[in-house]
């Protein structure tokens, strides 16, 4: 009896402990935690994760969740009031109840022989039977988040409000609004089979999201987190309530801020983001929601995302209906939308047909050359996007008179003025070019046509020598002969292989044999003509071309020194580049790209800026090569959706792999990486002990923040007294501005030249990848809804798929970057 008495005294204490935190992950039957109980939780063995109640945004409500670091939910059961509880019942069912006793959520495992629960070090919450076999798991029943080591298989769905994310059987990743409208459809590269049997998605410890399946050896890499490479970082993939899918990460596995490093889509392209009749646009930093005009009011002025409502319903118009014109605005639709239809019509008929039809509430006229007109019928959900580069005008039926927003009237006037200015500039440039060609032909006719020196040359070679700007057309046999059957290989890249050749007039040339070029004869010649019309000191000159049968070749001037990478990354002391050479190469390259972007008749986006495509002449002046081989952009809209983009990982801007439009700012990003390599002498994607196993660009920014810029400098230059540290600082600052995640945070190449030359003061740059505008702090999450783009990966590849299926009135969408920050923000006043 003396032995039993102490045990009986301890029994109440043991029972009490069932209601309080455990040191181990095992959770016995009968355990309970209360919403009102401070510090009550069921922790994982390493205390990284815990099951607990965290405050909800709604007042006096709490979310029952598995949390990271005690405050960041990665799985949730639901929300209850302060008297709610989460209990593992003796029946084996895990149940969340409100203070009134109402069941909010139930695991429905009361007949599965559950004997205990457990929260693992991976963040998985499981219920076990008497054989320690899981019968229920939070990983198998995800809510809005996927963590590392969690397998997300086809058929599972993440949900957040009206939005959902799922992995299709085909391997595609989709984001949907209200289960019907697919506004993001990210597919596998066409080289993979679309007939997958059981694909699974996984967020790897290095920050790469991959799809695995028996038919995919090694898996297919889908997207990269902006801080990929560091396996000591905790990351998770979350569907936020704004409809965007983001990758978050924390540098600490136990605490600290959680930042977003990638998001799936431009925020204004999220279907329904601004509610019914809401129009999404941007201010300097964030997406904003507005009504189409003053004929509408906000449903809730305190929450503009709830949409708008008509001040006067169409049924009360008494025949006084008219059309509200919204320029540069696109109302969204989706595939198989039952409340919309399309046909071919011009802008005026598209507007008039809708006005006269009782079944039409709005229409959209595409001004992208397609001639499409889309009509929205009663029952439609109206959600749209407005930005100056959007190639469409939307018409919304309203009760007259139209009361337009001030911003819309100003935009329309500015648009008309800009069109007039563009016409004036275009006519002047064309007239100047025609005059120059006429003078050159006249000079040749008068002075050179009878010169015997040209007697043995064909008319093509005569044109080569004396009519600069007109490319010479070679036959395939001529180029085969001058390269000795393509014997001496100079290099290879994403567009083909380069060979050394000697023309009959003894001119040494570089002959590029193009691969994967599918354009027809006429289109190829037009692009060659455009490339050959570009003349700049820092561009490699195109001499001629061959377009014969399936053969497509380009002939360039020859650079004996080869490309920049031969000097920058070599250990050969004979090829060492002094600081003066490096700075001049950086400046020359910037000037060459500026010419392509801002001074050509057509904006030429290079799409593959890297050291291998920067050649060095005998005087070590930079010559940019391979420009114009990607699609030329419309000067009125320098955005382009590429279905098979080419580039080199490590230099690709985040928007490439995020399926967002490619612009001239994508070249700026690539140039920024090259700039950092010129300073450091190291590849931007190098990971080593010196960089603490971080990507070099991220490590370099951390050293810059510490004021240790000299650590970034090439060690071979560290003892060189001739190094201009002011130039080093300008190059480093400029490089970090160039590699900002958001395209409009990056400077134009014209600004880059000014920054390098010291014409303008450069403000300290923002962290290019490690600091995000979406972050968790304490128990709450704050977001500016800035879209975080995917980062380029550490290895090279020549081709990526960039197809997109989200349709905006039937046309593939091409929205702008989500964060609208003025380029002036990086420059001093």
UniProtKB/Swiss-Prot annotation:
Leading EC class: transferase
Domain Bulb-type lectin: 26-140, 143-260
Protein name per its UniProtKB record: G-type lectin S-receptor-like serine/threonine-protein kinase At1g34300
Catalytic function, reaction form: L-seryl-[protein] + ATP = O-phospho-L-seryl-[protein] + ADP + H(+); L-threonyl-[protein] + ATP = O-phospho-L-threonyl-[protein] + ADP + H(+)
Keyword NAD among record annotations: no
Compartments it resides in: Cell membrane
Organism encoding this protein: Arabidopsis thaliana
Residue span(s) of domain Protein kinase: 484-759
Lineage: Eukaryota, Viridiplantae, Streptophyta, Embryophyta, Tracheophyta
Broad class of the protein's primary localization: membrane
Residues annotated as domain Apple: 317-399
SMART domains given in the database record: B_lectin, S_TKc
Entry binding sites for ATP: 490-498, 512
Domain EGF-like intervals: 264-301
GO CC, any one term: plasma membrane
Region feature (CaM-binding): 572-589
EC number: 2.7.11.1
Topological domain spans for side Cytoplasmic: 443-829
Parts of the chain that traverse the membrane: 422-442
